[in-house]
A protein has these predicted regions:
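Active-site-adjacent pocket-lining segments in enzyme domains
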Residues: 112, 120-141, 148-231
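Short, glycine/serine-rich, charged loops/turns that create anion-binding
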Residues: 37, 63, 115, 156, ...
């Protein structure tokens, strides 16, 4: 391929990606939390919809390498309390067909906290990352908790002081789903992540658009509108 042809190809690719990103910005509806159980009412307010009887694809995969997993059951119970039917999808155990079917058929997508690096590794291995982006582009509401919020950013390298990247030995590329241009920073002021959050803010605060949120807060995204809600 000649330099001129290559340059033109790259330009065309850039235009396509920019257009796709613009389309995503128009359709996206995201609720990004640190601790969902603490902000479940804010989610109900955010949707403005009757939640009873609706279904949510619940992905707990990020919790697999973690020794502490209470947040998985807490998040599930909070969703059920809102009247949602929880349909679990564990990526490491599901077929490609099961992953696509569940992500497409349910009304919402929810990804729990856990190890962000392991989560991204499994999303990429299974192709679930692309399907989730497709569903967000079609207007489906996405709910993220901690690691599930972080993966919406362009790249997850910034949380290496919060999560152990060694838990994802097959992950070589830290570029993430890039549904938002900002970088969620969960558990701001909350034990046991307070020191890690401050270290990330000190190291990346001038380079990245960090959005620190406590367990009582969430980042809401509707189209181009981004807000932090909660106390």
């Amino acid at each position: 391929m000649s330099a001129q042809t290559k340059s033109k190809t790259e330009q065309n690719k850039a235009v396509t990606e920019e257009q796709a990103n613009d389309g995503l910005k128009e359709s996206r509806k995201l609720f990004l939390a640190s601790s969902f159980k603490d902000v479940a009412k804010l989610f109900a307010d955010f949707t403005g919809e009757e939640l009873k009887g609706k279904s949510v694809t619940f992905i707990p995969t990020a919790s697999i390498p973690e020794s502490v997993k209470f947040f998985v059951s807490s998040g599930r119970k909070a969703l059920e309390k809102l009247g949602l039917t929880v349909d679990e999808l564990e990526l490491t155990q599901a077929t490609g067909e099961e992953i696509r079917n569940k992500l497409e058929k349910n009304d919402y997508i929810y990804i729990t906290g856990g190890n962000t690096f392991f989560l991204l590794q499994e999303l990429k291995k299974t192709g679930a990352d692309k399907i989730i982006i497709e569903q967000i582009e079609k207007g489906k509401t996405y709910i993220g908790e901690s690691a599930g919020s972080i993966i919406m950013s362009p790249n997850i390298e910034y949380v290496k002081d919060m999560d152990d990247c060694r838990k994802a030995p097959e992950l070589s590329d830290l570029s993430s789903l890039h549904v938002v241009d900002l970088y969620p920073l969960p558990h701001h002021t909350n034990f046991p992540f307070k020191k890690a959050v401050e270290k990330i803010r000190a190291g990346y605060g001038e380079q990245l658009t960090l959005y620190p949120i406590s367990n009582a807060q969430a980042i809401t995204v509707k189209g181009a509108e981004v807000r932090v809600v909660g106390k």
